[in-house]
């Protein structure tokens, strides 16, 4: 397997791996800082600011990817289907000129918009605004005609008032060793998640046997999200093909995401022989990255594909990923949003 760049510390998700002393020493400092910051907002010493439309925040209490982007894309699509005009506010992690706000379109260069915002715009056609100030992004979306705002990875952005919080959890890794950064993966204590309105557990492919953990407090909704792959999209512009056409064949599989093994496992489950190539999350690709030495089809996630468009050829394929949630989740969410809209006069 190709491995390049920094990786998630092994001790975050393995209780048998010793935690380095410097990491343990810094935990109380980090914990005190985040507790103070949250207390300032909860007690009103720092003010939250809202916008005149419903705001959904999608986020997690752990560092790294948990499936927020597939869920955000599914949220946008479902809201559009229900007659809403959603807009997405994002930081645009890893982009150039990170301090500059901008609109992101499907054809915006990833270096300017960030890989996840460009992917969201490409998949949904929704208005996407990247800004380190999520409140400013939300206001811009409302001014542009959006009647609901989805704040991607905004759980810790307390300055923006929100109506619905959705926590996304990796169904396999959950909360790791349960420790705060840098000794563990937690941005905030696990107890913070109980303040959210919904918990979406990303179980990955449908064949998984992982079971959700019921929350302690009554009324908190925990919902399973499964990810499915059924087709491949040639990146040279040709029509999509069934993924089944590659069953029994060997391919190079590329993933520059937080948990690349999940993508590789999904391909293997479809009978595809995988030569895995894991890159760091948000990796900036060059054509030279694909000099694998053997001429096989190269399959990658859509998040990776948007960064490879400038040098795509007939050997590169993206694999569309679809997030599937129970119908009851959508009924519960849409019912809450409709009640909010009627109160806000949207």
Curated annotation (Swiss-Prot):
Pathway assignment: Glycolipid biosynthesis; lipid IV(A) biosynthesis; lipid IV(A) from (3R)-3-hydroxytetradecanoyl-[acyl-carrier-protein] and UDP-N-acetyl-alpha-D-glucosamine: step 6/6
EC number: 2.7.1.130
GO BP terms: lipid A biosynthetic process; lipopolysaccharide core region biosynthetic process
GO function terms (MF aspect): ATP binding; tetraacyldisaccharide 4'-kinase activity
Pfam families assigned: LpxK
Transmembrane segments: none
Catalytic reactions of this protein: a lipid A disaccharide + ATP = a lipid IVA + ADP + H(+)
UniProt keywords, alphabetically: ATP-binding, Kinase, Lipid A biosynthesis, Lipid biosynthesis, Lipid metabolism, Nucleotide-binding, Transferase
Binding sites annotated in the UniProt record for ATP: 62-69
GO CC, alphabetical: plasma membrane
Top-tier EC class: transferase
InterPro entries: LpxK, P-loop_NTPase
Coiled coil: none
Domain of life from the UniProt record: Bacteria
UniProt function note: Transfers the gamma-phosphate of ATP to the 4'-position of a tetraacyldisaccharide 1-phosphate intermediate (termed DS-1-P) to form tetraacyldisaccharide 1,4'-bis-phosphate (lipid IVA).
Family: Belongs to the LpxK family.
Protein name: Tetraacyldisaccharide 4'-kinase
Protein species of origin: Xanthomonas oryzae pv. oryzae (strain KACC10331 / KXO85)
Taxonomic path: Bacteria, Pseudomonadati, Pseudomonadota, Gammaproteobacteria, Lysobacterales
């Amino acid at each position: 397997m190709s491995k390049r760049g920094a990786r998630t510390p092994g001790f975050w998700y393995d209780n048998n791996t010793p935690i380095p002393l410097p990491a343990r020493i810094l935990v109380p400092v980090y914990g005190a800082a985040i507790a103070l910051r949250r207390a300032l907002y909860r007690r009103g010493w720092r003010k939250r600011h809202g916008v005149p439309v419903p705001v959904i925040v999608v986020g997690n209490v752990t560092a790294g990817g948990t499936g927020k982007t597939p869920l955000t894309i599914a949220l946008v699509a479902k809201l559009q289907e229900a007659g809403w005009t959603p807009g997405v506010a994002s930081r645009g992690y890893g982009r150039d000129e990170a301090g500059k706000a901008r609109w992101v379109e499907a054809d915006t260069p990833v270096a300017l918009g960030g890989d996840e915002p460009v992917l969201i715009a490409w998949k949904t056609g929704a208005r996407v605004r990247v800004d380190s100030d999520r409140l400013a992004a939300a206001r811009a979306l409302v001014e542009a005609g959006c009647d609901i705002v989805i704040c991607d990875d905004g759980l810790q952005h307390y300055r923006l008032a929100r109506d619905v919080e959705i926590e996304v959890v990796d169904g396999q890794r959950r909360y790791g060793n349960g420790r705060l950064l840098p000794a563990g993966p937690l941005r905030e204590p696990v107890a913070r998640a109980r303040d959210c309105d919904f918990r979406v557990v990303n179980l990955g492919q449908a064949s998984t046997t992982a079971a959700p953990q019921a929350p302690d407090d009554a009324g908190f909704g925990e919902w399973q999200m499964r990810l499915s792959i059924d087709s491949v999209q040639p990146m040279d512009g040709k029509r999509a093909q069934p993924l089944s056409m590659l069953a029994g064949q060997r391919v190079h599989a590329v993933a520059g995401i937080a948990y690349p093994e999940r993508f590789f496992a999904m391909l293997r489950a479809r009978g595809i022989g995988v030569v895995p190539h894991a890159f760091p999350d948000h990796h900036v690709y060059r054509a030279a990255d694909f000099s694998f030495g053997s001429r096989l089809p190269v399959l990658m996630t859509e998040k990776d594909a948007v960064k490879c468009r400038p040098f795509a050829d007939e050997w590169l394929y993206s694999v569309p990923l679809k997030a599937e949630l129970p119908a009851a989740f959508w009924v519960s969410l849409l019912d809450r949003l409709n009640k909010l809209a009627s109160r806000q006069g949207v």
